[in-house]
Structure formats: C-alpha cells, structure tokens
Amino acid sequence: MTATIIDGKIIATELRARVAVEVARLKKDHSLTPGLAVVLVGNDPASEVYVRNKGIATTEAGMNSFEFKLPAETSEADVLAKVRELNADPAVHGFLVQFPVPNHISQQAVIDAIDPVKDADGLHPLNAGRLASGLPAMVPATPEGCVIMAKRAGGDLSGKHAVIIGRSNLVGKPVAQLLLKENCTVTIAHSRSRDLPSIARQADILVAAVGRPGMVRGDWVKPGAVVIDVGINRVPAPEKGEGKTRLVGDVLFDEAAEVAGAITPVPGGVGLMTVACLLRNTVIAACRQNGIALPQDF
C-alpha cells in the first residue's frame, strides 16, 4: 500500500481563499478590516521565517498585518506591556507572541496576559477551559489544522479511534479535545506510555506531536490509518553539503507511507494549515468583537 499524500498546500490555500472572501464581506458590509499582530522577541531564525510568512499570508487575505520585533534582552515587564497595548488596540483583533521566547521571560505569564477574545493562538487558560467544556472558544491553530486534514482524508471521524502521541498544551491536549468533539474514541500517549508502538497500531487516526525526528516507524502504523505528522525537526543533511540541514517530521515518512492510507508530509503538511487557521481565528475574533454573525460553514 502506498498512502495518499494529504497536501497541506492545497487545503490551506482553499481555507485562505474562504478567509479572503469573508474579509471582503466584512470590509464591504461593515467597513471592518480584521487585523492580526505578531510579537517576536529575539532573532531566532526559524521564528523570523515563520513570522514573515504569517505577515505575507495576512496581507494576501486582505487583512491588516502588524509585526513588533523586540530585542532578545527585552524584559518580561516590557513584553507584558506590549501585550497590554495590543489588548487595548481596536485595530488588532487577534495577536500572538511567537514562541519560544528568551529564557528570562515566562511563556505562561505572556499567555495569561493576552485578552482571551484576541487570543489568536487559542492558548489562554480561559480558551483551553472553554474548549474542554465544549463551549465556543478560540481554538489553537495547529490542532484545528490537524483535524481539518484528518477529516479531508478520513471523512466522517465519528467512532474512529484516534491516538495522539504527545500531551502538550499547544497540540496534544487540544487536538484530543477537538477529536472528542468529532465523536472519536481518543487515546493520549506520551513518553511514559508503556508499549507505545502497540498503542499507536490501534489508531485509525494517528497524530504525532512529540518533537522527535522519525520516532514513529512504519510498524507503528495500522494499515490504512490516517497519519498526521505535526513534528517539524531540523536534522543534519550532509548530502546537501557541510553544515546543511533538512526538515523532517516525527514520523519516518517513507516507512509509514507504505502502510498508512493517508499521511501528511513534512514540510508541506500541518505547518501550512497553522497559518491558514490563524487567519481564520482572527476573522472569527473580529466578528465576535463587533457582534457580527459568521457564515455557518466558516
């Protein structure tokens, strides 16, 4: 068996097109232009690329893009002051602070300071609690992208067994909540789980989000399963030249693709969906803040 490739570029492009249509409607009918802001502390190369791509995508969707680059030595107090400034800015409907931040800044303190209604990344404890309670919430972009891709590949997910490898607040826990909402039977596995390969082999939907390159082997995959690889790991690539690297996922792609029914590639998979879902979240936030109803299928 050779798996169908779940093309993140195609699905993300479709979602971004829907976002652009909704942005155009908001401009025409309500004179409202959604705005997404990103705060970057320091000069991490991967974060800089990611922030730049977010800005391009935001502008292409017809939205306002705001970027704030702060030096790595910026104090936690000054970062929190910038967060409060964005909380109060009516032109900014959604924003995020790009992680990781320097070690002297508490990531949780930053998350807690964000106004939950502007929490484009869906990480605030209030949004996490509402998601767990089945209430309307800002949903983390990467988990939302995972579920969209799983539904595209697997259709109706109701009754299927989903196994998530990873229990982070950023991906593992929220993707589990979203799959429960889709009426899946959900198992969360992690580094302390016993006999992890046998747990993974039970999955109709296998989500790998552990940050370990190639951890999930082909014999971990149930034949015909949908495999969603959230990992983005940079590993040495001597074949490209001295000091060169390449991106790989948490799944050993070539092995898993021989067993799975459908699989996301890295790159070209979940990462592209994350940006598209951030744009969608910002439009949702803009509508909620202005009492504007969204289309039912948005």
From Swiss-Prot:
InterPro entries from the UniProt entry: Aminoacid_DH-like_N_sf, NAD(P)-bd_dom_sf, THF_DH/CycHdrlase, THF_DH/CycHdrlase_cat_dom, THF_DH/CycHdrlase_NAD-bd_dom
EC number: 1.5.1.5, 3.5.4.9
GO MF term set: methenyltetrahydrofolate cyclohydrolase activity; methylenetetrahydrofolate dehydrogenase (NADP+) activity
Pfam families xref list: THF_DHG_CYH, THF_DHG_CYH_C
Pathway: One-carbon metabolism; tetrahydrofolate interconversion
The keyword Oxidoreductase belongs to this UniProt entry's keyword annotation: yes
Gene3D superfamilies: Leucine Dehydrogenase, chain A, domain 1 (3.40.50.10860), NAD(P)-binding Rossmann-like Domain (3.40.50.720)
Catalytic activity: (6R)-5,10-methylene-5,6,7,8-tetrahydrofolate + NADP(+) = (6R)-5,10-methenyltetrahydrofolate + NADPH; (6R)-5,10-methenyltetrahydrofolate + H2O = (6R)-10-formyltetrahydrofolate + H(+)
Listed GO biological process terms: L-histidine biosynthetic process; methionine biosynthetic process; purine nucleotide biosynthetic process; tetrahydrofolate interconversion
Origin: domain of life: Bacteria
Keywords: Amino-acid biosynthesis, Histidine biosynthesis, Hydrolase, Methionine biosynthesis, Multifunctional enzyme, NADP, One-carbon metabolism, Oxidoreductase, Purine biosynthesis
Binding-site positions, NADP(+): 166-168, 191, 232
GO cellular component, one term: cytosol
CDD domains to which the protein is assigned, alphabetical: NAD_bind_m-THF_DH_Cyclohyd
NCBIfam families with a match to the protein in the record: PRK14186.1 (NF010783), PRK14188.1 (NF010785)
Function: Catalyzes the oxidation of 5,10-methylenetetrahydrofolate to 5,10-methenyltetrahydrofolate and then the hydrolysis of 5,10-methenyltetrahydrofolate to 10-formyltetrahydrofolate.
Quaternary assembly: Homodimer.
Family: Belongs to the tetrahydrofolate dehydrogenase/cyclohydrolase family.
Descriptive protein name: Bifunctional protein FolD
Species in which this protein is naturally found: Parvibaculum lavamentivorans (strain DS-1 / DSM 13023 / NCIMB 13966)
Gene designation: folD
